[in-house]
Amino acid sequence: MTRAPAIDPSERYVLLTTFCRDGSPVATPVWFAPLPDDPDTLAMITDREAGKVKRLRHTSRCTLAPCDVRGRPHGDAVEAEGRVADDPGEVAAATAALAGRYGWQWRLLGFGARLRGRDPAASRAVLLVRPTAPT
């Protein structure tokens, strides 16, 4: 029996909620792509200095919910565990999955970074988030 994914892969955005040290939630809409070798793990990309990177480094607990581009959820949130990918192979797989999923939008994002004098690959962090099994 095949298990349905926690987040519908046809969604364009997911609301990633990370938690501050004091436990307060911070929600952000982000692009995501399932990893080809592990479709339960979702890859996301953000600026290396973003707050969500810092928050995931100190606590892996997060939640995911389908949402629109403005972060308005339209489905239930699921508990998840997230981490910042440091392995070059994981970063390459995540980057390829996101580039394949978002196509011209992905290329435009890189072009915009280069216009601002930034190396897109050096200025971003890859997040890997996996919904936790319901208990």
Annotated model-derived regions:
Residues 1-15:
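Short, basic/aromatic recognition patches
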Residues 1-5, 24-26, 38-45, 86-92:
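A broad, low-specificity signal for short, low-complexity segments enriched in glycine/proline
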Residues 1-3, 127-132:
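Short, small/hydrophobic-residue-rich motifs at membrane-helix boundaries and re-entrant hairpins
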Residues 11-48, 54-56, 62-66, 75-79:
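Short beta-strand segments
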Residues 49-114, 123-128:
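Short, structured beta-strand-loop surface elements
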Residues 116-118:
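Short proline/glycine-enriched turn/loop segments at secondary-structure junctions
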